[in-house]
Every structure is written in C-alpha cells, then in structure tokens.
C-alpha cells in the first residue's frame, strides 16, 4: 500500500549560542543605602564556588552564565547565581537587589579601585558616579558582518525590550517619573543609546574609531549602545534592559532576544533588508519606553504615533512567534508575558509597594525578596531590612 508523507519544515542545523550577564546593587540591609563592598562579596562568592565580577561602582556586582544553546539550561544557572550571590552578600553583611538603580545615591568615593575603573573616572568625571544595573544577553553569530546586519534588524524592537524590563523608578528616595531611570542616566554617556543604522562592519568600526579618537570611549568595551557587536567569540549583545526583577523575567527577556536574533538571521538569509528606522524617532521611542514602561504609552515606529505600551509587546510576540514555536518556547513566553501584563513588571511593582506602604524601605525589602524568587535556595544569612 502506497503511503504519502507530509513535508515538514527542516530542523534548524544549529541553534545560536546564548549567554547572560546580570548586574546587581549591594545595599546595607538596615538602611537600604548602597554598600561599597563588592570586593568582599567577590571573595565570599569565591568561597561558595561562584565567580563574580566588579563593576564601576563598589556597590555593584556582576554575574555571568556559561555559554549554551538551550534556554532552559540557563534557568538553573540564573537561579543558582542569584541565590549564591545573595548568600555571598549576606555573609558580608549586605543585601543583593535586582534593580536598575539604587534607591539612594552612593557616596562620591564609590569607584572600584582598579586601574581601568580609575581611568574611566578620571576621563568622565561625575558620569562615573552613576550606578546602573542592566542585563546583557549575548547571542552567537557566525561573524562580524552578520552581527552588524542583525543589529540593524533589532533596532526597532529595542524600546519594547526596555518597556518590558523597566525596573528603576525610584532614586534618592523618590519616584523619578520614569519607569527606567537607569536608561535616562545611561543616556549621559557619549557612547550610549540606540546605535545608528550601519551599512557594513567597516561602517560600524569607523564609528568606533571616531569615538576612540575623540576620547568618548577609552576602548571598544566602552561602547554602551543598546545593542552592539561583541568579539571573542562573535556575538550580538543586547544591553538596553534594566536588570529584571525576577529570574522569570530574565528568562523571558533572554528567550525573546534569542528569537529576535534568529528571526533577523532568517530575514538576512532570505535577502530581506532591515527597516531603516529614523534614528531620532528611535531615540524618542526609547525615551518614551524609559518614561512609561508598560503602564502608559509606547511610540510605534511603524505608524509614528503613540499606542498603549502592551500593544508593543503583542507586536513583538507576533514578530518572533514562528521561531518561538520552533524552539518549543512559545507557551512559556506567552504565559510569562501575560503574567507581566497582568501583574506588572519591576517598575510597576515598586511603585505599587511605595504607594501602599509609603516607605522606600518596604520597596527595598520587596525587591530583595523578588531577586531570588523562584530560585531553589535562599541566602542562608539574609538580614531583614
């Protein structure tokens, strides 16, 4: 008896690699003010078997996953790194917060004492005193030329990723009026913001050379664009997001970025050019995302008009849904996005807690709890605020 077969879409030969970096604030558990103790926490983490990195301010710490290809493998790493880092912080008398900015300003002498960090402080003055914690998602690419093309395809989606993860509405003990105050602060750096559209890797490298020559950056690591090309190994690094409040939100962000890069690579393979979004319109959309987050409006770069911010999330989900289905992640991402839209992201929850209790101390306590929410363990010696 003859049989027929139904043609199916061929399996993707290779899934791009993934890696995630998260930056955190260290605070005094009794006052909520920044704790300048990253060196001690790094040493404590080493004893617990985790490698932590210092950031520009002594009240910051960074974690990084290993490189892998499966989203769900990263979840265990993210949970473990948050829980163990919170434990390392507690053992040195401080508390770990997944927030985009500290809710109180650090002292002016907060620069981490390394040659590189001192050089940055000397060159950029008061800019270096700002404390900003983000989440950086690296997705592997074959080479630099394709990385630049993918960056062009990702530009229109940057504001949506920021609105989704906004997690820094409070600074100096007050609501700033922005869902992501971190993004506004970061915009003061000369190499920050959305990148322009680049014709080629040579065009991209020429822009870096001009910034180096002017002193706007000291090296290529100081290119703070919202998405950039990274080397060794070659990746596209999406940097626009505040550090998400929870592991679940970091997982959602990571999966969306992974799907965006794969979707862009597929478009490049088909010969579909990236949209040449006007740079000033994109900057305006990013500002709007920083201001409103998910609770207000976003700027639609197709219609050039304001729309409810949740509609931007639905547009993003529609754009990457075929890849999410292929990766087996559509249900997880759809459910996570629905939960965020119903219950709020980090910025919304911080404001809700502040409105309910009227004390920044309660916001800090809630943020500390959510930092390792859903993780397997909690810090052994966590101190209540």
Swiss-Prot record:
Alphabetized GO MF terms: ATP binding; glutamate-cysteine ligase activity
Keywords: ATP-binding, Ligase, Nucleotide-binding, Plasmid
Highest taxon in the source lineage: Bacteria
Catalytic activity: L-cysteine + L-glutamate + ATP = gamma-L-glutamyl-L-cysteine + ADP + phosphate + H(+)
Enzyme Commission (EC) number: 6.3.2.2
Biological process terms in GO annotation: modified amino acid biosynthetic process
SUPFAM superfamilies referenced in this protein's UniProt entry, alphabetically: Glutamine synthetase/guanido kinase
Protein family (similarity comment): Belongs to the glutamate--cysteine ligase type 2 family. YbdK subfamily.
UniProt function note: ATP-dependent carboxylate-amine ligase which exhibits weak glutamate--cysteine ligase activity.
UniProt protein name: Putative glutamate--cysteine ligase 2-4
Organism: Rhodococcus jostii (strain RHA1)
Lineage: Bacteria, Bacillati, Actinomycetota, Actinomycetes, Mycobacteriales
